[in-house]
Design a protein with these regions (language model features):
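Flexible loop/turn segments at secondary-structure boundaries
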Residues: 68-69, 217-219, 245-251, 301-307, ...
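Flexible, acidic glycine-rich loops studded with aromatic residues
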Residues: 404-407, 415-565
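Gly/Pro-rich turn-and-neighbor structural signature
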Residues: 340-423
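Contiguous, structured surface segment used for ligand recognition
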Residues: 14, 18-204, 485, 496, ...
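Structural recognition of the beta-strand scaffold that forms the well-ordered cores
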Residues: 207-210, 239-241, 296, 360-362, ...
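Conserved, mostly hydrophobic/aromatic
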Residues: 60, 162, 209, 230, ...
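Feature activates predominantly on carbohydrate-active enzymes
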Residues: 136-332, 338-342, 347-360, 382, ...
Length: 565
């Protein structure tokens, strides 16, 4: 996991959110790039000679029989793409609501057309219907998340086998539009998308981001904001670290003391907080609408002081420890031989599993210093059985790889571990190497937020590695995906989190999505430079990493995305 061994023993003073620092240009000259899409598509050909122009006549259309999920994506596209307005100071209105085509009709000119399609034919999702052939300029790649984006001067077509692919194709279209669409400023000119084709699908199924809301609490609205930013970069797993020594952050109805006591504070002694089950369910729904699966983590048997202070019977001596507001680790553990411990674990897994439609439950399992190895192995294997009883697949940090895991369980590696043994038994691995993707590490020695026990992690360090060759004995077939955690020892406000998360999360998103052959540091840094204005338009408090040529990158070779009237 995070934090641990090399961090100081006392809680740090709360650091005010840093103001965005002045852009610092890298020494390298500007690099011309054909597009600024992140993650890099599997294949993209964009022409400089022509473009599709969005204006007041543009409409979003879907097939007559398109399911509700497709209509939802179409509504998101219509809401995102503004109609140009010539009225200074007024926000640009969205496109009209999408409309359904009549059966058998072709999409009209001047339209953005979303269609479920396989092998060049539109897919009728009704069980009693046969596929309706519609001429297609491109077929989407296979897989639920693949898509094809085809732009002509007359039409934009996004085709995909499943609604998730349409959603990701819409994010690519979004990034081909100018950053001004993000804040809906007055656009007294027409918007243009370069003509060309994109065929794209993810390399890995799991492209994750972890928020530690236990050490410092984040309000539901702040979590939703991170979900929105994840969607922009095609990330699809939100791992919520919901319990630790410093706080318990989700209501458990059978154990109300967990939030009444354990949710009452955080690092530094602040007021803490927690999510009601209704708020958590709302977060899950909000994320699902953006094709993000929520993965809950309740750390056990260590990192449990908030639970031990709430329910003394979970301690082997039955005593109540004080609430903890520092950042040390390893001093707490559930009593592994207590029947009360296992009633508690069952209650938590049962209630949270019922609230979480995704297939995973994360038990933590890291940094256990108070149990013998035999006790630890017994705990993990028994917890695994409870997780399976409630229909979920167990995930645990690196340390669980030393136990007899079921092949359906997943190891999330953060340090060198025994994952190769789990892979040899048919198990899968999530790669979260601390020295590469722990976003709570400082960028450099001058960074005011974050820690450095795993080293300094600049943007290139987060980007420049290949998951398939990273861990001996763990090949690409055994890798479920990659995930970037941000631990919150030094983070108090949403702006603090954003400062350490961006732009490194965009780098990790490309590691997880793009084929290795489509990746390269020089091209990435050039594309990332063009995301500065987009992140600014979204109000993100991102770090102006000096290795990125913010403001220097040459304009795309494709036509300028904003075309005067």
């Amino acid at each position: 996991m995070a934090c641990a061994r090399a961090v100081p023993p006392a809680a740090p003073a709360q650091t005010p959110a840093p103001s965005p620092v002045a852009a610092r240009a890298a020494a390298a000259p500007p690099v011309a790039v054909p597009h600024a899409v992140i993650p890099a598509p599997s294949s993209a050909t964009l022409a400089a000679a022509d473009s599709f122009r969005v204006d007041s006549t543009t409409q979003v259309v879907i097939d007559a029989n398109a399911p509700a999920e497709v209509e939802a994506v179409a509504r998101a596209v219509a809401a995102l793409v503004p109609v140009a307005t010539a009225v200074p100071g007024q926000p640009a209105p969205p496109l009209p609501a999408p409309r359904r085509l009549t059966a058998g009709a072709a999409p009209p000119a001047r339209s953005i057309y979303l269609t479920l399609r396989q092998d060049g034919a539109a897919v009728d999702v009704r069980k009693d219907a046969s596929p309706t052939a519609v001429a297609a300029p491109a077929s989407p790649p296979a897989g639920a998340e693949g898509y094809a984006l085809d732009v002509t001067a007359d039409r934009v077509t996004i085709a995909a086998p499943q609604p998730a692919g349409l959603f990701y194709g819409a994010q690519t279209l979004r990034q081909l539009l100018p950053p001004a669409v993000e804040h809906r400023s007055a656009l007294n000119r027409r918007l243009a998308v370069p003509v060309g084709q994109v065929a794209d699908a993810p390399r890995f199924a799991w492209r994750g981001f972890m928020l530690d809301v236990s050490r410092h609490f984040l309000a539901p609205a702040d979590v939703k904001r991170f979900v929105d930013l994840m969607a922009l970069y095609k990330l699809n797993r939100l791992h919520l670290h919901l319990s630790d020594d410093q706080g318990w952050r989700l209501e458990i109805k059978s154990r109300p003391e967990l939030t009444r006591v354990g949710g009452s504070t955080q690092i530094g002694g602040g007021p803490g907080g927690f999510y009601t089950q209704a708020e958590y369910a709302d977060l899950v729904r909000y994320a699902a609408a953006r094709y993000v699966t929520v993965v809950p983590e309740f750390d056990m048997p260590a990192h449990t002081n908030a639970a031990l202070a709430s329910i003394p019977r979970l301690n082997c001596d039955g005593r109540t420890p004080p609430l903890y507001t520092g950042i040390r680790v390893g001093f707490s553990a559930l009593c592994p031989d207590s029947a009360e411990t296992w009633r508690f674990v069952d209650d938590v897994v049962r209630e949270v599993s019922a609230l979480t439609p995704g297939p995973y439950f994360h038990i933590g399992g890291d940094e256990v210093q108070k149990l013998t190895h035999a006790q630890y192995v017994g705990f993990v294997e028994r917890a695994q059985g409870i997780v399976r009883r409630y229909g979920k697949r167990m995930i645990g940090w690196s340390e669980v790889a030393t136990t007899a895991l079921d092949p359906s369980s997943v190891v999330q590696t953060w340090i060198p571990d025994s994952s190769a043994r789990h892979a040899a038994r048919g198990g899968t691995i999530i790669l979260s190497p601390a020295k590469r993707v722990y976003l709570d590490m400082k960028y450099d020695s001058a960074t005011t937020l974050g820690l450095r026990w795993a080293g300094l992690v600049d943007v290139r360090t987060s980007y420049d590695w290949d998951p398939a060759t990273f861990m001996p004995g763990v090949g690409e077939r055994s890798i479920l995906g990659v995930e970037a955690p941000v631990w919150s020892e030094t983070l108090v406000t949403r702006q603090d989190y954003e400062f350490l998360v961006f732009p490194r999360l965009a780098a990790v998103a490309e590691v997880g999505w793009s084929p290795q052959a489509a990746r390269g540091w020089d091209g990435f840094r050039a594309r990332l430079a063009q995301h500065g204005p987009r992140l600014q338009a979204l109000g993100v408090n991102f770090y102006r990493a000096p290795e990125i040529p913010w403001g220097q990158t040459a304009a795309p070779a494709a036509p300028a995305p904003v075309v005067p009237e």
